[in-house]
Structures are given as structure tokens and as C-alpha cells.
Amino acid sequence: MLPSCYANGSMLPDNEELVNSMLANPDYLRTQVSPNPLAPSAVGGAGMEGLMCGSFSPAFYYQGIDSFLALHNNIWGLPISFLHNSHRPEKPPFSYIALIAMAISSAPNQRLTLSGIYKFIMDKFPYYRENKQGWQNSIRHNLSLNDCFVKIPRDKNTIEDNDSAGKGSYWMLDSSASDMFEQGNYRRRRTRRQRHCGHPNRYERESGKDSNDGNSSAAEIRSPSEPLSDFDIFCNERPNYSDRITDLHRQYLSVSLGFNSLFNNEARGLRPLPEIRECPDDVDASSSSSKAMQSSMELHEELHSPSAFTPPLNRRETSSSGAPVLAEAFNGIKDVVDAPGSSPVASSNRSKTTLFTIDNIIGKP
């Protein structure tokens, strides 16, 4: 059976009033705590009546928690976030691209190293002074993946202001992306643009020499007396990746054109067949059929010869001469036929005995 104090709640004061009274005077809990009534010295001569709840001090039930309750008068009404660090600065409402652009624009020479960008962000925005590894990785990714930022090689022998050592490279804003952020509003970002250098690259300059439009290409080239900026020097030394791929594709097409012409019907129709000498009147009809078979096999050997797959050095020479370069493969056959001292009959007999024809297979005389 429970003690009477648990059955009748009127004997104890209200819990809320008790907590408020203890918070108002925290020393009350320490001074009013009585010894444990359940100790042997306390219950030695007392009966069950001495163990009634009414004989305990109210502070007995709350001892040990006064230091926690004394933190705040309304601690139980505070949110859970109060237990965390509530003094961390708020995250700035700017993207990483905007932070990088702000850092580079604030530099005197409009260029900064990677460590300089880190320093600017941490000095201006205290939020980024913690968890440096996470946001610094994001800064590096945005520098390498966006065309609005240009990496400029740095001279290791020169040390500028605010630079501890000549290491790393400079980062600059692309001149073609100057209008990406409108009126200093770094929250907006336009569609990603592809960077184009102001000067023609090496491949365009070589092609411009062969073309007849020399005046137009010369107008685009800046005069030698005008100084070049770091960005222009960087573009001249390193052409765009897309331009290099385009030039490689152009070279591949020029080489593969020789292979495609072998299977073109129009080019095949223009290819002359090797000369076949007229046989004497005493040769029968079977020899004429063997000659036709011989010419077809020679054409097959022409298409499958290694020289047929050699691309022509110049297409103009091939088209102007009228005879393709593949006709050189028959020079050996023509030399045998046109050799001095050989008669037409001897050449026809040699072709009958050496060629792999249907007549030789069936053994027809």
C-alpha cells in the first residue's frame, strides 16, 4: 500500500510553485536538505509513522538537479537548438562563384592566388572560418569548372604584395564574362558562356596564310606596338581545347577521304582498266573468256593491294592527271607485257599458265 502522501496530493505544494521558489533561491536546496531519513540512525527508534512522506523535506526530492535548473528560469520552454552553439554566424546568401568574383575584383591587379581567395572569404565572412575543408573544395571545383575564371601562370621569382611565396597560379576574371553579374548583384548568374580568345590561334593563322583573304586576317591581328595583357598572352600560348579537337577531326577526314574513295561508285567508274593486248586471230574463243577473267582478277587485286589503301598526297594532282595514283600498282604488269623480245603469243601463253583461271581448274586444254 502506498503512503498517504501519494494518495492525497493536497499535502504537497504545487510542483510549478515549488520549482519557481527553488529557482528564485538556489541556496535553499543546499541548506534545507536533511539527512537521508532511511539511514539506520534515522530509523533506529522510529516506527512506520516516522517514514511518512509528510515528514520529508520537499528539497529531498529535488536534490542534485539544482545546478541544472538554475541555468534559466524558463529552461523547459526553450527549443532544442538552445543546447547547440547559437553564436555561429549566419551563412551569407552568396554562391561560391559570387564569392570568388568578389575576391578577385577586390585585388589591386584584379587577380588572386587560391590562398588569397581563401583569405578574403574568411576575413569578410566569419561563417567560413569553420569547416574549411568542405567549402574550400567547393571553391576549387568552381574555379576549374567555370569559364568565367582564367588561370594565369605565375612567375616563381617575383613576389607581389600580400604574397608570402611565389607558388601557385593567379586566377582572373574572363573579360568576356564581365557582364555576367549585373550591377554587383552576385546572386544572379547568366547562362554559362564559352571563352573565346581575342587573337586567332596557331591553326587559324596557318590556314589564313593559304587563303586569299589576307586583308581580313591581318586586320584581326593586333599591332606589335600595342602591349598584350596577361589574358591575351595566355590565349596565344594555349589555344582552346575545342579548336584542337576541331583540327584533329579535320585531319582525320582528310586522311579517311582516300579510303572512302575506294568504295565510291563514281570514282570506281573513272578508274581505267589495265590494257589488254589484242590476241591473234588464231586464238580460240576460250582464250578470250580467260582474258576477261584475267582482267576481273587484276581489278580485284588492285582493290586489295596495299598500295590501294595509301591516301593520295594531294587530291588536285590526282584529279588533274586523269589517272589515279592506284594505277601505279599495274606498272609491274605492264613492264612484263611490254618487255623487249616478248611476243604477244608468248605473253598470252605465260598468262594462261600462271594465272588462276577457271580453265586451269577444270583442266580444259
Curated annotation (Swiss-Prot):
GO function terms (MF aspect): DNA-binding transcription factor activity, RNA polymerase II-specific; RNA polymerase II cis-regulatory region sequence-specific DNA binding
InterPro entries membership: Fork_head_dom, FOX_domain-containing, TF_fork_head_CS_1, TF_fork_head_CS_2, WH-like_DNA-bd_sf, WH_DNA-bd_sf
Protein name: Fork head domain-containing protein L1
DNA-binding region (UniProt annotation): 90-181
General function of this protein: Transcription factor. Coordinates the placement and migration of various organs during embryogenesis, including the salivary glands, hemocytes, germ cells and Malpighian tubules. Likely acts non-cell-autonomously to provide signaling cues from the mesoderm/musculature to nearby tissues. Mediates salivary gland positioning, at least in part, through activation of the secreted signal Sema2a.
GO BP of this protein: anatomical structure morphogenesis; cell differentiation; positive regulation of gene expression; regulation of transcription by RNA polymerase II
GO cellular component, one term: nucleus
SUPFAM superfamilies referenced in this protein's UniProt entry, alphabetically: Winged helix' DNA-binding domain
Record's compositionally biased regions (Low complexity): 285-295
Keyword Nucleus attributed: yes
Region entry Disordered, spans: 183-224, 276-295, 305-324
Lineage per the UniProt record: Eukaryota, Metazoa, Ecdysozoa, Arthropoda, Hexapoda
Bias (Basic and acidic residues) ranges: 201-212
Gene coding for it: FoxL1
Keywords recorded for this protein, A-Z: Developmental protein, DNA-binding, Nucleus, Transcription, Transcription regulation
Tissue localization of expression: During embryogenesis, detected in several mesodermal tissues including the hindgut mesoderm, the ventral intersegmental 5 (VIS5) muscle in thoracic segments T2 and T3, muscles homologous to VIS5 in the abdominal segments, and a small subset of visceral mesoderm cells found near to where the gastric caeca form (at protein level). Expressed in embryonic posterior mesoderm.
Protein's UniProt keywords contain Transferase: no
Biased composition annotated in UniProt, kind: Basic residues: 186-199
Localization per Swiss-Prot or TrEMBL: Nucleus
